[in-house]
Amino acid sequence: MKKIIVTTCLLATGFLLTACGESQSSNESQQTTIQFMHSSVEQERLSVINELVADFEKENPDIKIKQVPVEESAFNTKIVTLARSGKLPEVMEVSQDFAKVMDKDELIDQMAVQNVIEESGEDNYYDGAKNLVRSEDGKSYIAAPISGWVQGIWYDKEKLSEAGFSEPENWDDILKIAQHFTDKENKQYGIAMPTAEGTMSEQAFSQFALSNGANVLDDEGEVTIDTEKMREALSFYQNLSQYTMPGSNDVTEIKDAFMNGTAPMAIYSTYILPSVYEAGNSENIGFAIPTQKDQAVYGTVSGLTISSGLDEKQKEAAEAFTAFLSQPKNMEKWVLMSPGGAQPVNKQVVELDGYKENEVIKSFGELPSEIASAFDEVQVFGLVGEKNFTKMGDITSSGVIGKAVNQVTVGNEDVDQSLADAQKNTK
């Protein structure tokens, strides 16, 4: 407890009247202070977070929130450093992948997170968003989703329509459209797609693999890269890459090709939408999901997690603050820090007037609702049923999938050999 020294209440008689300091002293001593670490360092975003914190503290005068804003590029390293020194913040914004790392090291209070999700209404979240933050055994959660993004195939509705094509519904449709629009002599391509040796290539390829029933792990957590279903998917991806730009394509090349009209289709995340809006082309963009045996959307979520080992007051305060941020009206404010790019993970948010009437969201018509509902179709490597294997994070970090994609697309190497090597290097 802090000692409050009251100097202004000293009277000439030498008596100390404590009345003027008692109220403030009592309030401060009863407050529980917790830290909230997040990556919203930009002034506009920080203003939104400040407002949310102020609203919470007004409703909960016995809890004080101390913010710890950290640049996204340094965020995970900062958490590791704080964890080693035993100084983890009580509440943290985390990606689904890093939440797995933290959970593996027993840094997350799963029960506290579970309490928040139950209080917020488990059924209010899109199933895919919930699955991404399930614990490895599928029985609990490692973060409460607050926003996310999904990836699929974006297409120019006008160009496809003029060429006699409707929205691509399966692999064959995608291939036919890509073939039609490719004119390499004039540097026109059918689809802008990831081929670089990196995470984006793994993410893009995963949609085709999972839509064909191929996963990197089975329900026992065993590696299943070198399989017939995976071979079919990678062979298709290799074939499709004939109709993309030459070389190793990553984020910048793909976005630029779609935005400047070099390609009428692109595999990209929802973070392409703000640029489409700024270009005044909101009504002309469509969204398709790679489909073969099944639909498969790649998606990711940002969540709020609660650190383990807290005392009872800290834990209660952390749960209360996380539950507050998980209320639809507050999730709406969080998502609208990046309208179009960040997507709601709670079904109630898309029904709020503030979300629907946002200038950017409104410009896309029914598309935002269609995209948000795509969270129900989210599938990712390592998520098998309700099991969310933490070892998938290590496999992604190793780069074996992205390397295989790059080998067969840019390097035109043999699919069978690339998968065999990936399987061998993963075990």
Show which residues each predicted segment covers.
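Periplasmic solute-binding protein
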Residues: 102-106, 127-169, 194-219, 298-307, ...
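Short, solvent-exposed loop/beta-turn-alpha elements that line the ligand-binding surface or hinge
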Residues: 112-126, 195, 212-232, 278-280, ...
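C-terminal lobe and pocket-closing loops
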Residues: 100, 275-282, 293-300, 304-399
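Extracytoplasmic "Venus flytrap"/periplasmic binding protein-like
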Residues: 55-125, 158, 162-169, 264-265, ...
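Glycine-centered hinge/linker elements that transmit conformational signals in sensory
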Residues: 177-180, 220-248
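Hinge/lid segment of periplasmic solute-binding proteins
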Residues: 96-150, 175, 285-288, 367-372, ...
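Extracytoplasmic/periplasmic substrate-binding proteins
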Residues: 39, 99, 203-204, 235-323
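Conserved C-terminal helix/tail region of periplasmic/extracytoplasmic solute-binding proteins
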Residues: 161, 373-427
